[in-house]
Every structure is written in structure tokens, then in C-alpha cells.
A protein has these predicted regions:
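Phosphate-binding loop of NTP-binding sites
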Residues: 9-15, 21-215, 222-235
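ATP-dependent carboxylate-amine ligase
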Residues: 21-44, 48, 53-55, 240, ...
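Residue-level signal for inorganic ion chemistry
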Residues: 82, 162, 193, 302, ...
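A generic structural signal for short, well-ordered alpha-helical segments in conserved domains
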Residues: 92-96, 307, 419, 466
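Buried hydrophobic packing segments
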Residues: 95, 99, 119-123, 303-313, ...
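Adenine nucleotide phosphate-binding catalytic loops in nucleotide-utilizing enzymes
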Residues: 215-355
Length: 478
């Protein structure tokens, strides 16, 4: 039975220099433990904000007080979740933008805390003391390994799974192991929104009716053979017999079928029917044209997943297309900078994720303009300490022999490991400079008239570079 409690709530206003104390009488609180968890989350988050920090700590505190708090809160009618090896943050950011522009109040973890503590923090910090989330849509990015914990107590109404790749060997092992972990997060009542072009992801739709599929038709850049150092689509994930492909878009993503068990690419409701990199236009379902502000196949899939999710919840396709055509990602994965007299583009590629790196280098080469490339590998991960660099051998660095790349700068603690990896390619060693001292190397680069620069690194090393450059206004077409 609901009880009434007299409560003194302390609310810290980080925009002022004082503390506001409000005395409230909270009615219809179903659980004092839930209330205390929400209060602790709100107060700790405000304290962290006052000192300029954001973290998942408020969620950790709340879960200590009330471990099942996520099963007690009242969620919005629409709960959209996104997981997968790549594209989570960008897809969530685009969905949030489109939905907000359409008039919906969206609660989402834009700080990127995507494990259960971060998910708990974003939910509780945006709900009443009675446990009602104050939004029309709850939009959650979830780490693929921890989704099973985040969704133990509630089911997303719509669950997008983008892709599954080799990623962070120390933490994730093999993608088939990650597949099993994600599988545990899927609830019967959730509508799945799946990438039909990924043979591993498409397995989640087996024997399920409530599935929406998205994918891409054959394009000019599609190939009849696997690209990259390895092919994780060589064998069927269902029966382990050899897989056949009609075409590949990249890595193991494409149109596939198994002659032994029948596992194949599913028909899609949301389809990229044309990608024109020259004009920078992607066409969905033969009708909706979207301007590509970042001309990468990764971005095409992120846009498609966003389009599918927003369309499913009732937003008009023309509205979605118009908004995506004018929105540039704010997540810090693509930045414009100036280093000395040289202008450049900063690109995030997750360390330990070979597919992400391959796509970034493919983007640089596709631009086909004279440039120099800076690759920084200093700290492999933000989450754990490791010197394990076998993943370097999964990346197709051989493509960097392209004539448009005039010089390569290898920086950071693992620069010599990368130099060894490059020695097994056809790259001219004369255009490679190795320097483990990042600040000193950047000072040297700043003093040279190199022209266009590209810098490729991960979040763990991002600030080591950005602290030495001047950020400039993002260009529409990078």
C-alpha cells in the first residue's frame, strides 16, 4: 500500500553559487527504498556537476540502495534501446535529434555512460521522486556486454542491434561470444530492429514475428569478395558450413546465404536503395533522399537505423530525411582542427576494433586528396590497462600505401608496435615517421607545411591530441 512521507529534499543548483533547499511532502511513494535511491542519484549527480564531472557513480549509489529500482520506476510508453559493436552513440544521437525536432521530450544518455550504472543514472535523474520518468521517449545506448543487466528489469519497446564485430579482445573475446551475451538481453515483448546485412545479428530474428529489418541494396562500391585482413562471414553462424555471398559492402556485411541450412539475408522494410558519394546523397526506400554530411558507409547504416526507428514510432519520412540532412554529429567523433598552418580532420576509430579502423582508412582514401595521416596509439583502453596489441594485425594497414597519402606519423607508446605491423605491408618506409613522444611529435608536425591532415585515434588518446590543436568550425562535407 502506498504511504505518505514527510521529506526534506536537498537540491543543488549547479548554475548558482548557493544551495536551494526545498521542503516537500511526497505522496504516493510506492517504496521508501526506491525514493532514497532516486534522491541519492539526483543529489550525487548534482554534486558531480558542481565540480565539473559526469560519471555513472550516481547510478552505482542508487543500485546499492535499491538493486531492483529499474523495475519499480514508471517508464515512458516508448523505450528505444540501441546496442552493437559500432554505431551506438551516433545512431542514438541522431534518433534523439529527430525526435526532439518532432516535438517529443527525449531522455537519453548523451554522456555515453552505457553500462547498467549509467543507464540507471540517466533514468533516475530524470524521474519524479515517485518514480515516473519525465519524458515522452526513453532512448538508451547500451554496451553490448552489459545490455543483459540493463534490461533485466524492463524491456525496451524497440530494440535496435546495429552489428557485431571483433572488438576489444581483452574484454569481448570473439563476436560469437558477444552474440550470446546480447541474446540474453532480448525480451519476448520487445520489437527488434535488426541489421539484415549482418549474418550474426540476423540470427536474433529467427523464429520471431515482431522484427523490423533494415539493410542496403548492392551499390557501386560493393564487391564480390571480402575486403580486409580476415573474413568473419566465411562460415555460417548457424551451422558452421561455408557461407556464400552475392556481394559484400564491407567486412562480412552484405547479402549472404547458406546452402546447407538456409540462413540468409532477410527481406528488408527499410532499405538504402542508392548511395551516391559524388553528390553526397543516400536514398532510402527509393524515395527519401538524405544528404551525407560524413561520407562513410558506417554513417549510411547509422542513418538507416535512425530512419527505421523514427519511422516506426510515427514520424513522417520526409521530416526524418530533412532533419538528418542538416544535422552534424556532436559526439566528438568527427572534428575539424588546425595544427600550425595545417588544417585537418580528427576521426575516432576504436582501438582493438579492426572494422572501425578499416572504415576510417577507407574514408580517407576515398577522399583521394593529398594528405598526411597521424595515427596515435598510446593507451589501448580507458577501461583497463593492457599492452596487448595483437589486434593491430587484424587491421588492413596495407591500404595506406595509396598515393594520396604522402606521409604517415605513428605516435604514442605503441608506435613501434605499429611500425612493425606496417613493415609487413607494401608501404614505402620512407614516408613513415615514428615518435613515441606525442607532444614533441605534434610540435614538429605543426612547424611543417604539410597541407591536409587526418588524425586517427581512440577516446583513450583523444585529449592528448586535442590539447595541442585548435578546433575549428565543422565543415558540412568532411
Amino acid at each position: 500500500m502506498a504511504q505518505n512521507y514527510g521529506v526534506t529534499a536537498v537540491v543543488l543548483d549547479s548554475t548558482s553559487n548557493y544551495v536551494i533547499i526545498r521542503f516537500s511532502f511526497i505522496k504516493e511513494i510506492k517504496s521508501m527504498r526506491m525514493f532514497l535511491a532516486i534522491l541519492a542519484c539526483k543529489v550525487s549527480k548534482c554534486l558531480l556537476k558542481l565540480i565539473g564531472r559526469g560519471s555513472s557513480l550516481p547510478g552505482d549509489i542508487a543500485l546499492k540502495i535499491c538493486p531492483d529500482v529499474l523495475s519499480r520506476v514508471k517508464l515512458p510508453e516508448q523505450v528505444i534501446a540501441v546496442t552493437g559493436s559500432n554505431g551506438k552513440t551516433s545512431t542514438v544521437e541522431m534518433i534523439a535529434q529527430v525526435m526532439r525536432k518532432s516535438g517529443k521530450k527525449v531522455i537519453w544518455n548523451k554522456e555515453g555512460s552505457n553500462q547498467i550504472a549509467g543507464v540507471t543514472a540517466i533514468i533516475l535523474s530524470n524521474c519524479t521522486f515517485g518514480g515516473k520518468v519525465k519524458g515522452d521517449v526513453l532512448l538508451l545506448e547500451s554496451d553490448e556486454r552489459y545490455a543483459k543487466y540493463s534490461f533485466k528489469f524492463f524491456a525496451p519497446t524497440h530494440y535496435i542491434i546495429t552489428n557485431l564485430y571483433r572488438d576489444q579482445l581483452t574484454r569481448n573475446g570473439h563476436p560469437e561470444w558477444v552474440y550470446e551475451s546480447v541474446k540474453e538481453s532480448i525480451r519476448p515483448e520487445s520489437q527488434l530492429i535488426l541489421n539484415a546485412d549482418d549474418p550474426l545479428v540476423s540470427r536474433y530474428g529467427k523464429d520471431r514475428d515482431n522484427v523490423i529489418w533494415f539493410g542496403m541494396d548492392k551499390q557501386d562500391f560493393s564487391t564480390d569478395h571480402a575486403t580486409g585482413v580476415y573474413n568473419d562471414g566465411a562460415f555460417c553462424p548457424e551451422c558452421k558450413h561455408r557461407m556464400s555471398y552475392d556481394y559484400y559492402h564491407y567486412a562480412h556485411i552484405g547479402s549472404y546465404h547458406c546452402d546447407n541450412c538456409g540462413h540468409k539475408k532477410h527481406d528488408t522494410q527499410y532499405t538504402v536503395t542508392n548511395v551516391d558519394y559524388d553528390s553526397g546523397i543516400v536514398t532510402i526506400n527509393g524515395k527519401y533522399k538524405i544528404k551525407l554530411l560524413f561520407k562513410s558507409v558506417y554513417n549510411v547504416y547509422n542513418i538507416l537505423a535512425c530512419f527505421a526507428a523514427c519511422s516506426i514510432v510515427g514520424i513522417d519520412g520526409d521530416v526524418i530525411a530533412d532533419e538528418l540532412s542538416h544535422y552534424f554529429l556532436k559526439s566528438g567523433r568527427i572534428l575539424q582542427f588546425k595544427l600550425g598552418m595545417n588544417k585537418g580532420t580528427f576521426l575516432i576509430a576504436k582501438h582493438e576494433n579492426s572494422v572501425a579502423s578499416d572504415r576510417v582508412y577507407d574514408y580517407i582514401i576515398r577522399k583521394n586528396q593529398p594528405c598526411s595521416v597521424i595515427i596515435i596509439i598510446d593507451s589501448v583502453s580507458r577501461r583497463y590497462s593492457t599492452g596487448e596489441t595483437s589486434w593491430l594485425w587484424d587491421i588492413d594497414y596495407g591500404v595506406l600505401k595509396a598515393d594520396c597519402i604522402q606521409h604517415l606519423y605513428l605516435l604514442g607508446r605503441h608506435a613501434k608496435d605499429l611500425e612493425t605491423r606496417l613493415s609487413y605491408t607494401d608501404i614505402d618506409i620512407a614516408k613513415v615517421t615514428v615518435n613515441e613522444d606525442i607532444p614533441a611529435a605534434l610540435d614538429e608536425i605543426a612547424a611543417k607545411p604539410l597541407g591536409k591532415l587526418y588524425t586517427v585515434t581512440c577516446f583513450s588518446d583523444k585529449e592528448k591530441f586535442l590539447s595541442k590543436v585548435e578546433l575549428t568550425q565543422a565543415e558540412e562535407d568532411v
